[in-house]
Amino acid sequence: MKKLLVATLVALSFGASAGGYVSVDVDNVSARNGGTDSVAQYVRFGTEVAGVQLGGQSRTARSNGGGLFNSFELTAGSALGPVNPFVGIGHDNGNNGYNYGLVGVTAAQKVGPGVALVGVKTRVGSTETTPTKQTVGFATYAYPILKNVSLNVNASRSYQDIKENAFGLGVGFSF
């Protein structure tokens, strides 16, 4: 919980000084390959600087078995028409701790009063002895509840070595 609080404060201070967004989300994660179910807490933040979209994500998952796992990712991308391809780096603080690369793409569209975002990302390269392969498809609908505050509804599905389904809610703040 302390890590989540620190990550939230860092993200809020970054977002407040640079403009952009911060969201705090909680997902119920179900393993599809006999693994352990978990609850994942996310702090996400982002901004745009000189046409480059910068983002970050801290994910802390508590499994039913009592384990606590955390990862942190930073990404950079640039809009190409309706899509935003991105690259990034991540660090998994799991059992052995390792670094990995990311590539992905997102697209956002106003739908009704809110905004729908869909995307996919995959790990590339890793300092892990036996690299864990993971591709994640994700979707979020941000429904405005105040001028700069939204309610987020999230869904994702992981493929390859990590096979999970996740559904959750969160709150987003724009600056």
For every predicted segment, state its role.
Residues K2-F175:
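Outer-membrane beta-barrel proteins
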